[in-house]
Amino acid sequence: MDKYNEAIELIKNSKYLVVFTGAGISVDSGIPPFTGKGGLWTQYDPKFIEISYFYNHPLESWKEIRKIFYDFMLDSCKPNLSHKTIGDWSKQGIVKEVITQNIDNLRQAGGAKTVLEFHGTTKTLTCTSCGKKYDASKISLDKIPPKCSCGGILKPDFVFYGEGINPEVLRKSEQAILKADVILIIGTSGQVMPACQL
């Protein structure tokens, strides 16, 4: 049996299939990966999403964050066939959980039910002063940095360089991996820490 058919059989016969996705899955949706040839960090300086830089230079950070993640990624990118297939399998009960390193929300838009966003999401913003959460689609980014009703600066809810992974998401991801009898890995080299330790 060739590897393709062997993979099909493993998926068909799995009792607890977990899908683990990285940046490569969203390339067909028009989102370049962060690293490698044509990656975002060949076009933009990653310092703009370093947590210390963000706190010290929120306006400069938000200019790039808005351009990269909100003007482009969220406005024009739609789920591709891979996202939709995972969504269909999730609805059919084939895929039990999805762990994603992506922050683009395309697995959910494709229909996946249980998605653990390992590196967070662009869909929500949190006040750096009071902790209040906002739906990013309801916040105008015409004036940046966006601010909370308390006057605090809003930060996207994705993990910046220098920040830790949300402990609850890490715990649930580890549990999902332990429950899995098959893990389907799509679009990741498996080298990003700490996701590669799962």
Question: Whereabouts are the PLM-identified features?
Answer:
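Conserved catalytic core of sirtuin-type NAD+-dependent deacylases
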Residues: 1-198
